Curated annotation (Swiss-Prot):
Family the UniProt entry places it in: Belongs to the purine/pyrimidine phosphoribosyltransferase family. GfcR subfamily.
Entries under Gene3D superfamilies matching the protein: 3.40.50.2020
Domain characteristics, as noted in the entry: Contains an N-terminal DNA-binding winged helix-turn-helix domain and a C-terminal regulatory domain (or effector binding domain) resembling phosphoribosyltransferase (PRT) domain.
Record's keyword terms, sorted: DNA-binding, Transcription, Transcription regulation
HAMAP family in UniProt: GfcR (MF_01214)
Cited SUPFAM superfamilies: PRTase-like
Pfam families: Pribosyltran
Domain of life per record: Archaea
Annotated protein name in UniProt: Transcriptional regulator GfcR
GO molecular function, one term: orotate phosphoribosyltransferase activity
PROSITE patterns named among the record's database cross-references: PUR_PYR_PR_TRANSFER
A biological process term (GO) from this entry: UMP biosynthetic process
Organism of derivation: Methanoregula boonei (strain DSM 21154 / JCM 14090 / 6A8)
Amino acid sequence: MSSLDDLIARAKLLLSEGHSPGQIADELSLSMETVTWLLTQANGGSAAPKDVHIDWTAVSSQAPLLDGIALMLLNRYYGAQKDPAAASADVIVGIALSGIPLATVISVQEAAQLAIYHPAKQNASEHPVGSISGNFAPVAKERCIIVDDVITSGNTMREVVKYLKKHGAVPVAIWVIFDKRGIRDIDGVPVYSLFKISRID
């Protein structure tokens, strides 16, 4: 079985287990367009969308390695600041699902509060909206750093930034491990990634 066949099978398995296409996109670190294609693909169909699959489970499943990634993100961010003390945040916002463990580790290292954002794409309602979980820190009037594993299209990050600003928060930075788009900032909020992923055709 090819890696493409594996992805098609995995996407269909996740769908059969009740995952929404948005959750599948997060699980596989792929765009919604690619997931839609995987779920509707019959042999010999249309060409696959241009995307890059990232499997970082060797790190994400090991807490000590995840801690090391968090430390690299901290060093990457503070190393780029002219005044590191002024660059700190009150709240670390983890984007569900993959951003949550990373944000948790970072919030411990930063002695910051932890907030969790549920993107609209994970909401199965007819008119999906994203939201901050009421079980974690509030974001109003707080300086926030947004954390996730991958920027695929940038749509989720735009959604989070818009949500935070609308609710009176001040997003100061976006931290990701992998950036598939090479985005410098999202609506004025700078992006700090460890790795930029480029597809060369």
